[in-house]
């Protein structure tokens, strides 16, 4: 039994560590077995303790080591969710590194008017735009004075003690529009009155000229009563005017052509100037016609008589000379 145990020990442990076994029958060895067996058992226990120290199993982790990970499914899900932002960050970094094409947005409607490209066509190629509702002919009544606003007099209609726009700190825009003040408004009113009067005079002169050119003038002083309506119903002859004989349309056209040849514009002349020029031209033509008639009479009658008298005188002069010679 002891030999079998020794063999097993030899198989498990290194033979170098084994203790040599002495033969009990050897006369040179010790005679007593008990002390020897005790020593062998002590050595075996020491060897077993050394082996157990070599194969110790560590069941507790050191304090510096990280805690062990568990394989719970919930923990696995949390781990994957915590790792998702990292993957999103990596994908965003990759997207930022790779160039991307942005879609082209039409911003023509939101571009300010100052930066819009101008058209190559001129403005005259487009229709006019009517965006104002100002009435240029308006002349409203001033509520304080009861007069049209263009007829209001700052000094007469507003007493000195009732001109609130002169008070210190008063805003003039509360009383005058479009940048006017007391002085510029008075100048504007005078200018408007002069323009209206001038336009009215020109319109009246134009109407008179048109009536004159169409031979529809009322009878002038010295004209026969009823000659004007007769002239309207029957243009030729024209009603008589002071110093101007009756004219038919042909004579009227000739007179207008003569004025235009002299550099005069009949349409821009007032009626009185036109009548004076017409009277001068017609008087000259009448005088020329009378002279021509006188020359005709002189050639046909007076001239013949003079020639005849001159011949008779010549004859008489010759006869007288003859008589003188005879004398």
From Swiss-Prot:
Q: Which Pfam families match?
A: Fip1
**Amino acid composition bias (Gly residues), ranges on this chain:** 284-321
Domain of life from the UniProt record: Eukaryota
Primary site of residence: nucleus
Q: Does the keyword Aminoacyl-tRNA synthetase apply?
A: no
Keywords (A to Z) from UniProt: mRNA processing, Nucleus
Q: Which InterPro entries match?
A: Fip1_dom, Pre-mRNA_3'-end_processing_reg
Region: Disordered; residue ranges are 1-139, 283-327
Q: Does the keyword Aminoacyl-tRNA synthetase apply?
A: no
Record's GO cellular component terms: mRNA cleavage and polyadenylation specificity factor complex
Q: Which GO terms describe its biological process?
A: mRNA processing
The annotated regions of Polar residues compositional bias extend over 79-122
> Where does it localize?
Nucleus
Q: Which family does it belong to?
A: Belongs to the FIP1 family.
**Any idea what job this protein has?**
Pre-mRNA polyadenylation factor that directly interacts with poly(A) polymerase.
- Under which name does UniProt file this protein? Pre-mRNA polyadenylation factor fip1
**What species is given as this protein's source?**
Emericella nidulans (strain FGSC A4 / ATCC 38163 / CBS 112.46 / NRRL 194 / M139)
